[in-house]
């Protein structure tokens, strides 16, 4: 039996990854992390979506220690969420230092316990916004280190790594989940489900991608299939 663990926040990217994983694996587990994030609604959203999409199990892990160590606008009400991210010269204040290091490591430990062959994460380098832990070289390096440390061959899969946001919408549509991803996921930095607040960086990226996909469906779908190898 093929098993996978999805690092699952209930946002657009991880929900799209879960939708795909349900078609590619016999059994899919979801892991969501409570790190004292500013908008706790995402945990409830993740729980509902994991159930709706048929995850075998959904585990919420308490990693609130990260909140004490990592100062970010996503963990501190006193730090305002910017409408737009800074350019590639700087790291945005929405970056939570060490988050993906911790999440992927703990997801791999969970994968070890449930005998899963893969950990799936929705990080993406194409829409890189200054987050160093979304880079392909980081994921591969951590994957290598984790496998050495556990003497186990667990793959870190990044289905969205080389596709842009419009193509991510196309991927959700390919798996028949465009409406669910649009209406029921929570990507907004201000904690508003669906289309979100409409002005934070996450909402801008999401909306621009959706508009581009809806205006160029055939071309974007073709590009997505070419990049992902789907037919």
Swiss-Prot record:
<keyword id="KW-0479">Metal-binding</keyword>
<feature type="binding site">
    <location>
        <position position="200"/>
    </location>
    <ligand>
        <name>Zn(2+)</name>
    </ligand>
</feature>
<comment type="similarity">
    <text>Belongs to the QueC family.</text>
</comment>
<keyword id="KW-0436">Ligase</keyword>
<dbReference type="GO" id="GO:0016879">
    <property type="term" value="F:ligase activity, forming carbon-nitrogen bonds"/>
</dbReference>
<keyword id="KW-0547">Nucleotide-binding</keyword>
<protein>
    <recommendedName>
        <fullName>7-cyano-7-deazaguanine synthase</fullName>
        <ecNumber>6.3.4.20</ecNumber>
    </recommendedName>
</protein>
<comment type="pathway">
    <text>Purine metabolism; 7-cyano-7-deazaguanine biosynthesis.</text>
</comment>
<dbReference type="Pfam" id="PF06508">
    <property type="entry name" value="QueC"/>
</dbReference>
<feature type="binding site">
    <location>
        <position position="197"/>
    </location>
    <ligand>
        <name>Zn(2+)</name>
    </ligand>
</feature>
<keyword id="KW-0671">Queuosine biosynthesis</keyword>
<dbReference type="InterPro" id="IPR014729">
    <property type="entry name" value="Rossmann-like_a/b/a_fold"/>
</dbReference>
<keyword id="KW-0862">Zinc</keyword>
<dbReference type="GO" id="GO:0008616">
    <property type="term" value="P:queuosine biosynthetic process"/>
</dbReference>
<keyword id="KW-0067">ATP-binding</keyword>
<comment type="function">
    <text>Catalyzes the ATP-dependent conversion of 7-carboxy-7-deazaguanine (CDG) to 7-cyano-7-deazaguanine (preQ(0)).</text>
</comment>
<dbReference type="InterPro" id="IPR018317">
    <property type="entry name" value="QueC"/>
</dbReference>
<feature type="binding site">
    <location>
        <position position="188"/>
    </location>
    <ligand>
        <name>Zn(2+)</name>
    </ligand>
</feature>
<dbReference type="GO" id="GO:0005524">
    <property type="term" value="F:ATP binding"/>
</dbReference>
<dbReference type="GO" id="GO:0008270">
    <property type="term" value="F:zinc ion binding"/>
</dbReference>
<feature type="binding site">
    <location>
        <begin position="8"/>
        <end position="18"/>
    </location>
    <ligand>
        <name>ATP</name>
    </ligand>
</feature>
<feature type="binding site">
    <location>
        <position position="203"/>
    </location>
    <ligand>
        <name>Zn(2+)</name>
    </ligand>
</feature>
């Amino acid at each position: 039996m093929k098993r996978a663990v999805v690092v699952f926040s209930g946002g657009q990217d991880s929900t799209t990854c879960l939708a795909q994983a349900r078609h590619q694996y016999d059994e899919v587990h979801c892991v969501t992390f409570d790190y004292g994030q500013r908008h706790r609604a995402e945990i409830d959203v993740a729980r509902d979506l994991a159930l709706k999409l048929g995850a075998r199990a959904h585990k919420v892990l308490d990693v609130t220690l990260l909140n004490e160590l990592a100062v970010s606008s996503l963990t501190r009400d006193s730090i305002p969420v910017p409408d737009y991210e800074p350019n590639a010269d700087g790291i945005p204040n929405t970056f939570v230092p060490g988050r993906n290091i911790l999440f992927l490591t703990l997801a791999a430990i969970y994968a070890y316990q449930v005998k899963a062959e893969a950990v799936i994460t929705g990080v993406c380098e194409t829409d890189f916004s200054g987050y160093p832990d979304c880079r392909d070289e980081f994921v591969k390096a951590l994957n290598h280190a984790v496998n050495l440390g556990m003497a186990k061959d667990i793959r870190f899969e990044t289905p969205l790594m080389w596709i842009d946001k419009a193509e991510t919408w196309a991927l959700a549509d390919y798996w028949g989940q465009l409406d669910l991803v649009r209406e029921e996921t929570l990507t907004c930095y201000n904690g508003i489900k669906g289309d979100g607040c409409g002005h934070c960086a996450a909402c801008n990226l999401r909306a621009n991608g959706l508009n581009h996909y809806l205006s160029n469906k055939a071309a974007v779908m073709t590009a997505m299939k070419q990049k992902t190898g789907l037919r």
